[in-house]
Amino acid sequence: MFLLVCSGDVYSQHKTLRTINLVGYVVDSFLDVGITNAKVTLMAQDSTVVDSVNVRKRSPNGMVTYTEYSFNVPAQKSTYIIKAEAPNYKTGYLAYSIKHVGRNVRIEMPTLKLKKSRRYGLDEENVLDEVVVKATKIKMYYRGDTLVYNADAFSLPDGSMLDGLIKQMPGATLNENGEIHINGRKIDYLSLNGKKMFDGNNQLVISNLPYYTVKNLKVFEKNKDEDEALGKESRVKDYVMDVSLKKEYSKNNFMNAKAGIGTKDRMLARAFDSFFSDTWGGIAYVNVNNLNQTRLPGWDGSFSEAASPKSNVENKQFGLSGQYERNQGNVKEEFSLSGDIKDTETEKKQLQELFMPDGNVFKNTDERQDTRISKFKFSNDLQIKKPYLLKSRTQIEYQDGKDNSTSSNETLKEILANHTRKAERRKDRDLSLSQEIVWSALTPWGDRYGFQAKANYECGRVRSGEHQNIAYPRADADSIYEFVANENVKRRAYDYSLYGLYQYELLGGKRILVGYQYEQADEKRDRARLRNNLDDNSFHANTFGRFHMPSIGFDWQKGKWYAFAQLLINLQTDEMKYCKNSLDTLFSRSYTDLRPSLLVFRKSNDSYLELKSNYGSVTKPRVTDIVDARDDSDPLLITLGNTGLKKSSAWHTDVKYSYHNRSNRFSLDVTSNVNLHFNNIVHSYMYNEMDGSYTIRPENVNGYWAAALWLKTENIIGKARRWSFRNDVNYDYSHKIGISGTSSTAMSRNVINSHIVADKAKLSFQYKRMYIAALGGIKYQGSRCDSNVNMNYNAYDIHYGINMNCRLPLDIQIACDMTMYQRKGYDFESINDDNLIGNVSLSRSFIKGRLLVSLTTYDIFHQLSSIERTISDQSNTETTYNSIPRYGMISLTYKFGKH
């Protein structure tokens, strides 16, 4: 079949005259930027003129960085002379010979660098061709295939950060993890003035960059680094958002500092600094606060109960990131250093209902926990490209944690089974190191080949101690069991992988990709649990694995359509050793996984359709899961192994469709997915009715599946485009399987069917600097059990309210939001109530806009609460957390640098 395909392409080659696209660039030899008014002439070896063109601007990172020309010439060996000329520059020449034709369809030539004529000075205006555009109130428009959001057209409260702007942009969604979706598609990474900062961590950039510095945000598709380096056009491109700063901040150092003090011991101190030039840029920030959040009133009214700040959190954050590039971006280095120290005080009440065949078991818990987690991360990326690609990535991560907690809980079915009081302390440290090297190049005949080497090392240690008191109620007298235990767990692991790829270019837009990867991993775990001496729950475990992963893929592109199919075979062998007390066992397991995947999409100017489907292994059992051993270190939670446990696998399918009218009047986004799980690993629960303890054991079950559908519409209303209406509807369904039983009944399967239906709507109006929005939504959660377990839940969450910001007399800005939250159908009666959440902020600027004074009040009615509800295959859990207290704060913000 392979020979047949190749021969068919050869025949096609002779049947029609082939051409090759010659691509080159013209830049200023000193500034290394594009010359926008250059003219390029293609001549034969005897200086006969073949063709001539004017250069066009290329914006691979959303900014004008260089200018490009291209010619289509016959696909044959020949020599050409390229002449480039521009006003105020010396004419430049380049001789280029096509030595290898093969299956090449595009050849990138050396860059032509023109020198200034001596009679002229450096006229930066001719080089940069900067265009000054007067401010417009149009929020968004298309420039070719690039979607541009005009930041000045939006109305935000003073002191807002970039994330506030993104939440107001039409077609944009921003979740709590910092993931950005534009018109239904996820942004792969965010750049700042064309430079990627903080290793692509969107959250760090958007929550620290002041909104007032932003000129516009550009959303576009960009060639991947590998393809750009080799002069290829990517078939699956990165979806990028580039934040363009205003002129006064783009080539200058600027700094923003904010400090605030409030009631209830609230405080805030924050500083942001940045510098950008044509070749390098950097940003730095410091943020210290005990506010749990960065949100300002009047943003978008998304201060929902599920996302409300739970616990009391004090954050200390810092970061430094920079990028340097030269030679038209062919040499680029990026680095980032960040730190995050978080102190959390948590108080929670939890009601858990475990599903049992002869009556459910209830567990009530009260817990107080003080936690400190410190995270530090450093990364460095070096990239060299043209005529090949070489990438090196180094990353170091360190985490240190401390935890002190006290809790009390009681377990009961029809009568109280036990009452427990527990005090626990814990310290942990983790260090991870990783190094990756990627090299890719083209053969003279147009095929691509590449290699990748990657190595990781991790080590960690957990030390903990606990004091537990368990009371078992009896008719005559309570039985008290009390113990003190200390535990020390060490973990060391490494892995490395070697990967090779060859991409065979066929004619007609087809390619064959063949790859092979070898990986080796080793993990050691030592657990020493001490009461008075080393007890039976101490162990040593070691897992050594080898992976061989050959793969073959085929992709095809024609017009607006693209398809890619791949089959990867994972041949894995694990050698496991487990030592515990008198048990010393050594065994091995082998797995063969077939992992097919399919990607199909169609793109046009106003729509995008995508189908993605893949099958593969999800979870492989750990050595502690498959060894025949018992762990009763917690007398109320006993763990058993299962020697017959198998790996689990799943089939995932996603379908996306987006339609967006280029007039920006209407947009539609539809997303659906289906997940089918096979041999899903769950933990069976056996409840001991005598003492209230549980014995859990990993098991394989079939029948678990889930599906979801999400529909979003957005419409801009009126000729003046002042009104907009957005509606989001989503439906989630899950069919979960669990196993449970008691000491007096046999183990049985529980089939849990859960439905979540939600609808959120927002109507907004903006006129000049006044913005007002009305919003509302309802969410239904329903769960039922098809077996003999008693379970039938129906809960509702309803919210509605308004938010606004506008200018008052004396140049005072007010921003506020008011939202009513209602909950119905929860098991905790105290949860079923109404909460009115209100926030107000007043601000005014002084010293020509350099100084901003703000007065802010949060939760003015003191009704904020934090609730979570989860339903698994074994239980229904409702948890209430302490929330940050209501407070008022006065803050000062000062802008340094040119303004």
Regions found by a protein language model. Name each.
Residues 230-231, 286, 295-301, 345-361, ...:
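Outer-membrane beta-barrel translocator domains and adjoining extracellular loop/strand segments
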Residues 485, 495-497, 509-605, 609-612:
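Signature of Gram-negative outer-membrane beta-barrel scaffolds
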Residues 63-79:
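Short Pro-Gly-centered beta-turn/loop motif in secreted/extracellular proteins
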Residues 364, 537-539, 640-642, 646, ...:
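Outer membrane beta-barrel strand-and-loop segments of large Gram-negative receptors
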Residues 729, 772-845:
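C-terminal beta-barrel architecture of Gram-negative outer-membrane proteins
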Residues 12-19, 32, 41-43, 47, ...:
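Membrane-proximal, glycine/serine-rich, low-complexity loop/turn segments characteristic
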Residues 20-29:
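A short, amphipathic beta-strand motif
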